[in-house]
Design a protein with these regions (language model features):
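Signature of the SF2 helicase/ATPase Hel1-core->accessory helical subdomain module
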Residues: 1-10, 14, 165-283, 293-294
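ATP-dependent helicase/translocase motor core
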Residues: 1-113, 120, 124-135, 156-159, ...
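Well-ordered alpha-helical segments embedded in enzymatic catalytic cores
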Residues: 66-70, 94-101, 148, 164-167, ...
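Conserved helicase motor
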Residues: 89, 119, 140-150, 165-170
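Conserved hydrophobic packing residues within short motifs/helices of P-loop NTPase cores
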Residues: 113-115, 220
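Conserved AMP-binding/adenylation subdomain of ANL enzymes
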Residues: 135-140, 263
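Conserved motor-coupling elements within RecA-like helicase/translocase cores
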Residues: 146-161, 185
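Conserved helicase/translocase motor-coupling segment
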Residues: 279-313
Length: 313
């Protein structure tokens, strides 16, 4: 049945966008993109999530769908890549669906692994990931320890595994003996890795080590802050220094500008309170002056108290 007025949150209603994040206002073009067969079936079967915690059915936004489709197309030809989606735009949901759909869509993939950094274990990312998985058709299992990870990798079950980069490193470097059946079995798995916060979760050195062990692996990174030539990884031998060199081509982009335009994230409130009657505003001594700094603190702590919501803690 249709949702009641109290259940449909208009804040989350959005128009359709094409792959380049351009609005599609034409009704017939929208119908062709979304409502014809098999697109309409896929929208329901592949791009909805039942959030166990919120007790809501979530329909993915267009940019999330385009990113997942781009990953699927890349995987068909054995290519890796990365997705640049701004912070706050729902990367966790997108990466969950990408991880899940890879396992369901590509029969040659034995397992998909959602890889996170240990310090992110108890964050909203993993809690949200598990909430999405509770009512899914695919088994999504977290790993309690390295032995548990090894057991899940040895299992014949095709499954989504959520684990940390640290456990994976320990497994391949210390817990597997070469030339044993379990070593060969795990080493020969066809695995698709989906990496959250890929700009920092897996270093170029660690990724190379994992790729050399899992020679048949695919890699898909999600980040809101990619590494470019302007902000590269530190130089370390011949290791890649940008996100594109590390993961492959960018598969989809949804920047902060796109998100603010679509009201997918909150915009910025900018106010200028600079020094007055100053001949040279580029003179750093003006801003290092104690009188000026105290005035700035007064504006932030006292005059912006309610505006910035400090009263709410």
């Amino acid at each position: 049945s249709a949702a009641s007025d109290t259940e449909l949150n208009e804040k989350f209603v959005s128009g359709w966008l094409d792959k380049e994040n351009n609005p599609v206002p034409d009704l017939f073009e929208f119908t062709k993109c979304v409502l014809r067969i098999p697109e309409a079936h896929e929208m329901i079967a592949r791009y909805t999530v039942l959030d166990e915690d919120a007790k809501r059915l979530i329909l993915l936004r267009p940019y999330q769908i385009h990113a997942i489709e781009a990953i699927r197309e890349a995987s068909k030809t054995g290519k890796s890549g990365y997705v640049w989606h701004t912070t706050g735009s729902g990367k966790t949901l997108t990466s969950y669906k990408a991880t899940r759909n890879l396992l369901m869509d590509i029969p040659s993939i034995d397992k998909t692994i959602f890889l996170i950094d240990r310090k992110d274990l108890d964050t909203q990312t993993t809690m949200a990931f598990q909430a999405y998985a509770n009512n899914d058709l695919v088994d999504v299992d977290e790993t309690d320890n390295v032995n548990d990870l090894k057991k899940k990798l040895k299992s014949e079950d095709r499954q989504v595994i959520v684990t940390t980069i640290q456990k994976m490193q320990i497994l391949i470097s210390k817990r597997l003996k070469e030339d044993t059946p379990e070593y060969q079995k795990i080493k020969n798995l066809k695995i698709a890795f989906v990496v959250d916060e890929c700009h920092r979760a897996v270093t170029p050195k660690t990724k190379r080590e994992l790729e050399r062990f899992f020679g048949r692996s695919l890699w898909y990174g999600f980040t809101g802050t990619p590494r470019f030539a302007e902000n590269p990884y530190p130089q370390l031998g011949d290791l890649p220094r940008t996100t594109e060199k590390l993961y492959g081509e960018r598969l989809h982009k949804y920047t902060i500008q796109n998100a603010i335009h679509d009201k997918a994230v909150l915009g910025f409130q900018v106010e200028h309170n600079g020094p007055k009657n100053v001949a040279d505003e580029t003179d750093s001594s003006v801003y290092n002056n104690e009188t000026h700094m105290l005035r700035v603190l007064d504006i932030i702590l006292n005059k912006s108290y309610h505006k910035l919501g400090f009263q709410n803690g």
